[in-house]
Amino acid sequence: MPLCGSSSSSKHPIERKIVILGDGACGKTSLLNVFTRGYFPKVYEPTVFENYIHDIFVDNQHITLSLWDTAGQEEFDRLRSLSYSDTHTIMLCFSVDSRDSLENVKNKWVSEIADHCEGVKLVLVALKCDLRSSDEYGNESAITPGSIQNQKYNGGGGNGLIPYDEGLAMAKQIGALRYLECSAKMNRGVNEAFTEAARCALTATPKGARDSAPEAESSSCTIM
């Protein structure tokens, strides 16, 4: 019997599913390992499929996140399509040291999402942002939107890395609700990225194989 002033529903966390997409080797699995297990893997091992369960509190709401790690390689396209059912939010990732991974956001991933999970809420996430601030001695400076925005992109860039402004422009182009940047290696911006994705998922209707009627959505991008 619930105590006075409480409800039985408050005992049960809200369940939300988030799928993590992006090119192979862009850093998705490292991002998930740091967030759910607190460690950064030293050796790259390609992921075929893995599911993580993690509890998080957002806006005083207890949420149980089902986080689906997916393989970005083309040979896993058919297997990956099975991940989209009943998805609340997709974290679409690219690496700042791979222009192909950014171009594939619009050339591959957006169309695949439209085919399998039309209308789902999107969050665009830039990974490996510590590479922008690494100096020749391997030191790292703080990753902030201000410092990233001040770095100019000149053709291939002074260091060939994708700048903040270009990632933000892509987020607006694809209609992502959030644009976030983080470094799993340095554990900077990781919790913030999942918090914002969970916040988007809170108000989302699940999309995918058994989705319901389309819901009205704002396509504006929030800069984080």
Curated annotation (Swiss-Prot):
Gene3D superfamilies linked to this entry: P-loop containing nucleotide triphosphate hydrolases
PTM-bearing positions, type Cysteine methyl ester: C221
Motif, Effector region: chain positions: 44-52
GO cellular component, one term: plasma membrane
Residue ranges, annotated region (Disordered): 205-224
Database matches in InterPro entries: P-loop_NTPase, Small_GTP-bd, Small_GTPase, Small_GTPase_Rho
Binding-site residues, GTP: 22-29, 69-73, 127-130
Domain of life: Eukaryota
Lipid-attached positions, S-geranylgeranyl cysteine: C221
Keywords for this protein: Cell membrane, GTP-binding, Lipoprotein, Membrane, Methylation, Nucleotide-binding, Prenylation
Recorded family membership: Belongs to the small GTPase superfamily. Rho family.
Function (record text): Involved in the regulation of actin polarization. Rho proteins are required for distinct steps during polarized hyphal growth of A.gossypii.
NCBIfam families: small_GTP (TIGR00231)
Name of this protein: GTP-binding protein RHO3
Species, as recorded: Eremothecium gossypii (strain ATCC 10895 / CBS 109.51 / FGSC 9923 / NRRL Y-1056) (Yeast)
Gene designation per UniProt: RHO3
